[in-house]
Amino acid sequence: MSRKEELYDITIIGGGPTGLFAAFYGGMRQAKVKIIESMPQLGGQLAALYPEKYIYDVAGFPKVKAQDLVNDLKRQAEQFNPTIALEQSVQNVTKETDDTFTIKTDKETHYSKAIIITAGAGAFQPRRLEVEGAKQYEGKNLQYFVNDLNAYAGKNVLISGGGDSAVDWALMLEPVAKNVTLIHRRDKFRAHEHSVELLQKSSVNILTPFAISELSGDGEKIHHVTIQEVKGDAVETLDVDEVIVNFGFVSSLGPIKGWGLEIEKNSIVVNTKMETNIPGIYAAGDICTYPGKVKLIATGFGEAPTAVNNAKAFIDPTARVFPGHSTSLF
């Protein structure tokens, strides 16, 4: 295949909600679109971190399960058959003399007339449990993500953490698991006030201020967890079937920092057209920043069409930035 045949109109780096909607909108603008995603699946953090959790602040949905939203976004984008490249991490972007871009991943090289970066918070990794022997149980019955609530049915579950995810998982697992214990190293939870209120009214066993001090198991599964009172002498040993740790996540822009883009506080600076400082490269969603920026899925859904429409005009100066409403296009 020649480079000309491989040349896409718009390449979207990041296959989360904003990237998926950008792919749909790019297709609607009759652009040849490709998505490059570093994860094994599309959906970004919604699919990777909390597919079973409900989202309440997407317009038109009183509530929607994260994975269901991802599935709908995929179906919407698939109407225009975008090319999908999964498990590829973009390492470098080069602007060529003909104003097109060469995009090198850890697996292959891609070519595009314009780029939209929708990489969310960048690459993210969970903050891990720093207790002796923890690593050997990761992916067995020590988890940092909950992908399937039913996997915890009838089990004794210990959750460690004090933020939104830890509290939300405790509440969601309460009716599924045999029992749920939530420990936090501080007396006060950092989660949303309403969630904490629901937690206090639930049957979840709350132990504060405690932290995990020891794991006991057979190398395949943890059977007992010892917890130590923080700044105290109390010690308890709990029987467990599953352990979920949520201490938050560490995100990084990684190679993006080396692409020559203007970066501010780990975000890509854009103007009202979603243009970066490099003509032909746009950014949308949580990865970008501008005065008054609010990082919400709903915001990304508005920024994606802005980025696509301006990318279309960049590729084809005769194209209208605003194409009209979808009701007149289908």
From Swiss-Prot:
- Annotated GO MF terms: ferredoxin-NADP+ reductase activity; flavin adenine dinucleotide binding; NADP binding
Return the EC number.
Answer: 1.18.1.2
Enzyme kind, highest EC tier: oxidoreductase
Binding residues for FAD, per the UniProt record? T18, E37, Q45, Y50, V90, F124, D286, T327
InterPro entries reported for this sequence: FAD/NAD-bd_sf, FAD/NAD-binding_dom, Fd--NADP_Rdtase_type_2, Ferredoxin-NADP_redctase_2
Q: Which domain of life is it from?
A: Bacteria
Catalytically driven reaction(s) = 2 reduced [2Fe-2S]-[ferredoxin] + NADP(+) + H(+) = 2 oxidized [2Fe-2S]-[ferredoxin] + NADPH
> Could you give the cofactor binding note from the entry?
Binds 1 FAD per subunit.
Q: Which UniProt keywords apply?
A: FAD, Flavoprotein, NADP, Oxidoreductase
Please give the cofactor(s) recorded in the UniProt entry for this protein.
FAD
Q: Which family does it belong to?
A: Belongs to the ferredoxin--NADP reductase type 2 family.
| Record text on subunit structure and interactions | Homodimer.
Put simply, this protein is called Ferredoxin--NADP reductase
What is the species listed in this Swiss-Prot or TrEMBL entry?
Halalkalibacterium halodurans (strain ATCC BAA-125 / DSM 18197 / FERM 7344 / JCM 9153 / C-125) (Bacillus halodurans)
